[in-house]
Amino acid sequence: MYINIEKTTKLIQEKGCDAVILFNESNMHYICSFSPSEGVIIITKSGNSYHIVDSRYTETAQIHAQKTGLKVIEIKNSFLNEVNDIVNKENIKRLLFENETISLAQYNSYAKKLNNTEFVELNHDFMLMRNKKEAFEIELMKKANNIAEKSFLELLNEVKIGKTEKELAALFDYIMARNGSDGVSFDTILLTGTHTSMPHGVPSDKKIKDGDFVLFDFGATYQGYHSDMTRTIAIGNITDEMKEAYDLVLKAQLAGIKALKAGEKCADVYQAAYDVLNEKDMGKYFRHSLGHGVGLDIHEGYNASPKSNDKFEV
């Protein structure tokens, strides 16, 4: 049995249910190894697994099913009717569903049709399962990260005075694609000068000038898995104050890395970095969390913020 389906059947059994139904694109990818824009996956507690698709995805689903073992079903008239047939066939009485991502309208339509089935909230349990990556997932994430890093180093040759943020951001996306990225993890953030104070700023027609910081926030994807990197460089001659700020942020980053270990609270890792900044009264400018988990989603699982109750696990 495909490892991710095996893990899912254990979750179903632990929750005392008969099956789980998945609509979320990332959750479906976790099971079927690609990202259809629409579809339904049902997995039973015994491991019977179904992937319901429309004709746009039948061939792709069948190719991936050779690895996953999913039974591919092409809809005849509606997803709901196909789901109803499977629920009756498998005698599903308690069905886990994605209560945090499904729309109210979709829930109501399924609950009305499957009126003899109890819907049980999945909550965070599926994401908690996804948090722990299998070896093959780690390799895919490494590949995405390597593509992003290689592309960044290539882009540096093009970062020159007079180039605009938009121009370089577009070039960056092209270089990542050329190096094997399936797409960007998120809209590339490339900012210069005073714009670098905005953690999620949007590239503009602003040109790079001598003495600027240039901020890069970017990621590549590979077979559905994301990477996320942030880098800052200086152009030409910069002030002593800018050098001090750069060194302070680097020191804070290294303190966070040192504190990062299995069993450590995410909030404590954040605090380790914050304390370094606050030594120079710069903590008030730390407006963003220290970091977050990545995977099939760009923000997945852990969040290293002061309010997080999570602990890092191996």
Describe the residue ranges of each PLM region.
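Active-site neighborhoods and metal-handling regions in enzymes and metal-associated proteins
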Residues: M1-V314
